[in-house]
Amino acid sequence: MQSELQRGFVLHRRPYSETSLLVDLFTEESGRLTVIAKGARAKRSSWKSVLQPFTPLLLRWTGKSTLKTLAKAEPAAITLPLQQIALYSGFYVNELLTRVIESETPNPALFQHYLKCLTGLATETNIEPTLRLFEFQLLQILGYGVDFLHCAGSGEPVDFSMTYRYREEKGFIASLVKDNLTFYGRDLLAFEALDFSDDAVRQAAKRFTRIALKPYLGDKPLKSRELFTQNILLLK
């Protein structure tokens, strides 16, 4: 069975044999899937340069099992120019998708969010708002439901100036305790509006998404985060 030609990106690739690659793809219509790219490691293979992260592709594959066989891959546009921190951030986004979304689950909305995220990483001077927005959009699609507008204890509307402590599976409860789980009401209101224009809100959002994504990622560290940390240390 051969798929229709559809848009997609390479999330990750690794050797499969002396001449082939195992490639994780994220496609517009079929979601995430893994394919064998036969002969892609051969010296004369045109796929060697095509199957790269951050290159918009047109893809077709065959097979009914979980592991498909790549039949066609060609660039749909030029590779998005991610450099330095933006490049490591792109690897981080790819690793998130590889680890938290189920295989072969169509999600065109997430594909559009991903495309906009990569475009933002390639063009924006400050990439933090782009990353935080994508993380929140991903959490929404994963079904992570949390009320940012009401106190989980009293049901009262969140107060801009008060502090709230996050409790997993319950939400935010008004609290005077200040630790890693504590957020200002103004942060929660900004989260609801997906407004990450303020630096303090971005820092709070980064802290929250690390907490919220942990159940999906488990205890295994993100390789992209380790790679970023190692390279920052080398530059110092």
UniProtKB/Swiss-Prot annotation:
<keyword id="KW-0227">DNA damage</keyword>
<keyword id="KW-0233">DNA recombination</keyword>
<dbReference type="InterPro" id="IPR037278">
    <property type="entry name" value="ARFGAP/RecO"/>
</dbReference>
<keyword id="KW-0234">DNA repair</keyword>
<dbReference type="InterPro" id="IPR012340">
    <property type="entry name" value="NA-bd_OB-fold"/>
</dbReference>
<dbReference type="Pfam" id="PF02565">
    <property type="entry name" value="RecO_C"/>
</dbReference>
<dbReference type="GO" id="GO:0006310">
    <property type="term" value="P:DNA recombination"/>
</dbReference>
<comment type="similarity">
    <text>Belongs to the RecO family.</text>
</comment>
<protein>
    <recommendedName>
        <fullName>DNA repair protein RecO</fullName>
    </recommendedName>
</protein>
<dbReference type="Pfam" id="PF11967">
    <property type="entry name" value="RecO_N"/>
</dbReference>
<dbReference type="InterPro" id="IPR042242">
    <property type="entry name" value="RecO_C"/>
</dbReference>
<dbReference type="GO" id="GO:0006302">
    <property type="term" value="P:double-strand break repair"/>
</dbReference>
<dbReference type="InterPro" id="IPR022572">
    <property type="entry name" value="DNA_rep/recomb_RecO_N"/>
</dbReference>
<dbReference type="InterPro" id="IPR003717">
    <property type="entry name" value="RecO"/>
</dbReference>
<dbReference type="GO" id="GO:0043590">
    <property type="term" value="C:bacterial nucleoid"/>
</dbReference>
<comment type="function">
    <text>Involved in DNA repair and RecF pathway recombination.</text>
</comment>
